[in-house]
Amino acid sequence: MKTNPLPATPSVWGGSTVELPPTTRDTAGQGLLRRVLRPPISRRDGPGLPRGSGPRRAASTLWLLGLDGTDAPPGALTPNDDTEQALDKILRGTMRGGAALIGSPRHHLTRQVILTDLCQPNADRAGTLLLALRHPADLPHLAHQRAPPGRQTERLGEAWGQLMEATALGSGRAESGCTRAGLVSFNFLVAACAASYDARDAADAVRAHVTANYRGTRVGARLDRFSECLRAMVHTHVFPHEVMRFFGGLVSWVTQDELASVTAVCAGPQEAAHTGHPGRPRSAVILPACAFVDLDAELGLGGPGAAFLYLVFTYRQRRDQELCCVYVIKSQLPPRGLEPALERLFGRLRITNTIHGTEDMTPPAPNRNPDFPLAGLAANPQTPRCSAGQVTNPQFADRLYRWQPDLRGRPTARTCTYAAFAELGMMPEDSPRCLHRTERFGAVSVPVVILEGVVWRPGEWRACA
């Protein structure tokens, strides 16, 4: 039996004539997709209708798919109601969505209006790391909850009070308590901890930059008092990583007097956002060299490949020698494998906190059940006992020996905490670019590290003890 092939264009399927648009007809791969969704031998109207009966009234295909430009209700089938037109619109939308996804990587921006006491974007540059600070009025209450017995909990409130006297809202401290929650520039935080870094010259350059380029006549006093706040937080076990979190990488800003509206990339590629500056339309992450650690190079680990970025706080809890440092660490180690590497890198701090972390704490009362008397209980046949299956039964469990030790002055996980880290993001390139150079901030030269291709992906804090 001889069969005639179906015409290409215009095509006649089931009595309807459709001509495909040239752009859609010529697109590679669409012919195969059309054959899968609509075989050429399929009938449009299904089984034949009885003679004398009209076509069924059904919802338009485009209307059901939400692709019909008109808002008309479902009606009779029309020449425009066919699978080919619906398929054309679906394919065009898919192609546009894929092109948009490839052309512009997804990133998320966040904006906040802040006081410029601890963050002045005019002095820093696009790509500077910003941290969000919890409301300072909450910190004295946290100190009363978390400080061990014997610690001076009022020290934290006094330190923040002195800091507020050197800020823009110092005159209203008695009425408002403390200023509202705001942002802390990573450069300002490093400048406040400058005395604690090993690279002292580079840290002093960051402090000189903040002192010279931040507006105000009491910037130096503000740095000293903020440093005292950090030490008081370590003293009262209100650790800085518990009240600070990643906010984003600075992109653009608008300032007026003591206020600033800052925009930052909080997730996604840092370089995907436009800065609005003609000279530097894109921003790479810029960090002080004294606060950057290439962990793989320090420990001789890894090779070429993508790397993670971590924000790390370190603490020393020895009495009257408390300190706090902040770093950005690059490593190929995932979060679950970073803690052993930090223990090796900051092992001296871990030992110091384990030995001296309980100093200046109220000691336990003498002979107050210091140890669990397991040997004596096991040797005494009259000691109440029960089987493992009877432990959940109050009739047997209530007769067991109750050990009530005095844990005051004893080492705990908080007294031994020497570091805390949180994932910031990653550098997905096989060979991440870390450029070490000296940048001019006004009249001050600061050694910096520029990280290219950073993708922000912030995570939760993890304490190391």
Swiss-Prot record:
Region annotation Disordered: where it falls in the sequence: 1-29
Q: How does it assemble?
A: Interacts with TRX2, MCP and capsid vertex component 2/CVC2.
Record gene name: TRX1
Has keyword Plastid?
no
Tell me where it mainly resides: virion
- Organism, scientific name: Human herpesvirus 1 (strain 17) (HHV-1)
Q: Which GO terms describe its biological process?
A: viral capsid assembly
Biological function: Structural component of the T=16 icosahedral capsid. The capsid is composed of pentamers and hexamers of major capsid protein/MCP, which are linked together by heterotrimers called triplexes. These triplexes are formed by a single molecule of triplex protein 1/TRX1 and two copies of triplex protein 2/TRX2. Additionally, TRX1 is required for efficient transport of TRX2 to the nucleus, which is the site of capsid assembly.
The family assignment reads:
Belongs to the herpesviridae TRX1 protein family.
Domain of life of the organism encoding this protein: Viruses
Q: Which residues form a coiled coil?
A: none
Keyword entries, A-Z: Capsid protein, Host nucleus, Virion
The subcellular localization recorded is: Virion; Host nucleus
Full protein name = Triplex capsid protein 1
